[in-house]
Structures are given as structure tokens and as C-alpha cells.
């Protein structure tokens, strides 16, 4: 069981019908515990996601209410799919970023380099990088979809519009989004290894 703020997740490995029954019993115990402490789940918002290929079909319930089964669900702002592909998250992030970018293009009259870059960094790029270490894409089509947003932004800046994309990035002092994700992944690995092991213990483990 995992709990964060007002979100609760209960999960288990399912290899057959008995595992489904055990997970249902865990769900019943969780519901009983919540009621004992005078807390209530919003059952209409409770959902089931099955992850994997060999999936045992079972209708999970909370009291007499059958839980809705979903293929994609948002978890702490990130879209998770039952096949664990990150394409839905990439599409959603690009859609949000593109809406903001369109608003900037329509409303900003004086598109100086300094103003446009600051607006992009503040209002657009965070949509493309939120929690990216958890969903960094590995399919080329997803990488290109994300990069296309920054490509579109760079063409909105009059001072660099005539240049190629790589030259525009250099003049705007920007990295490609893939480079930034790779850098974020390296920082994440370094931070976690330092906190959990320390470099000395890590080298001993690798021997």
C-alpha cells in the first residue's frame, strides 16, 4: 500500500484467481480500517489498473460498487498507462505547453529575445520537464514530439528565425530538451547514490 496526501494505492502481484481474491480481501480490510477511523473513500473516484500481459480478469469492488477499470490514469500530475508506455504523458505535456506557447504568441507584441526566452523558461518548458526523470521517453517519435514544441518556440523569436534549429539554440543559450532530460537523469542518479550509498559503498558493491 502506498499513501501520499489524500491519494492511496493498493497493489499486488496477480498470477491467478487466488491472488485476485487476496487483493480483494486487502481492499476490504483497507475500507474497514478507513471506516473505523471515520474516514471515507470517494468510491466513485477509485479505479483499477491492470499492468502486464497475463492478466487475470476479476471485478474488484468496494462494498457493492464495482470499480471502474482504466487504461490511463494521472498520478501526481503524470499520466500512467497500463502498458507502462510514456506516450500519453508526452502527448499531454506537449498539449499543455503548446496552449501556453500559443497564448504567448498571440498576446506578446514586442517579441524581444530576452522577453521571449524568459517567458518560455517560466511558462512553457516546465510543462515539458515536470517529473521527467520518471517518464523520460525512449521512443524517437516521443522525443521528436517534445522537441517540436521548443523548435516552434525558437521560430517565434524574430532575431533568430532565419537560422537553423541548432544555431537558434546556441544564440538563445538553450539546450535541446533531450540533453536537459539526460542531464536531469544524471543528477538524479548522482543524488540518490550519494544519499543511499556514498561513492565508497557503491564501488564496493560493483566489485
Question: Where are each of the predicted segments found?
Answer:
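Hydrophobic/basic alpha-helical segments
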Residues: 1-207
Amino acid at each position: 500500500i502506498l499513501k501520499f496526501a489524500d491519494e492511496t494505492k493498493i497493489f499486488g502481484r496477480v498470477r491467478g484467481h487466488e491472488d485476485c481474491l487476496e487483493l480483494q480481501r486487502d481492499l476490504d480490510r483497507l475500507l474497514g480500517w478507513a471506516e473505523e477511523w471515520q474516514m471515507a473513500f470517494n468510491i466513485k473516484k477509485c479505479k483499477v489498473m491492470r499492468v502486464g500481459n497475463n492478466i487475470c480478469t476479476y471485478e474488484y469492488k468496494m462494498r457493492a460498487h464495482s470499480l471502474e477499470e482504466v487504461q490511463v490514469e494521472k498520478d501526481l500530475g503524470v499520466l500512467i498507462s497500463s502498458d507502462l508506455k510514456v506516450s500519453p504523458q508526452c502527448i499531454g505535456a506537449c498539449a499543455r505547453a503548446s496552449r501556453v506557447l500559443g497564448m504567448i504568441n498571440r498576446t506578446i507584441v514586442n517579441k524581444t529575445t530576452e522577453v521571449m526566452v524568459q517567458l518560455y523558461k517560466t511558462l512553457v518548458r516546465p510543462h515539458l520537464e515536470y517529473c521527467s526523470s520518471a517518464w523520460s521517453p525512449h521512443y524517437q517519435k516521443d522525443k521528436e514530439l517534445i522537441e517540436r514544441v521548443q523548435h516552434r518556440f525558437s521560430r517565434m523569436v524574430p532575431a533568430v528565425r532565419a537560422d537553423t534549429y541548432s544555431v537558434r539554440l546556441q544564440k538563445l543559450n538553450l539546450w535541446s530538451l533531450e540533453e536537459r532530460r539526460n542531464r536531469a537523469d544524471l543528477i538524479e542518479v548522482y543524488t540518490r547514490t550519494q544519499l543511499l550509498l556514498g561513492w565508497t559503498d557503491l564501488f564496493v558493491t560493483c566489485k
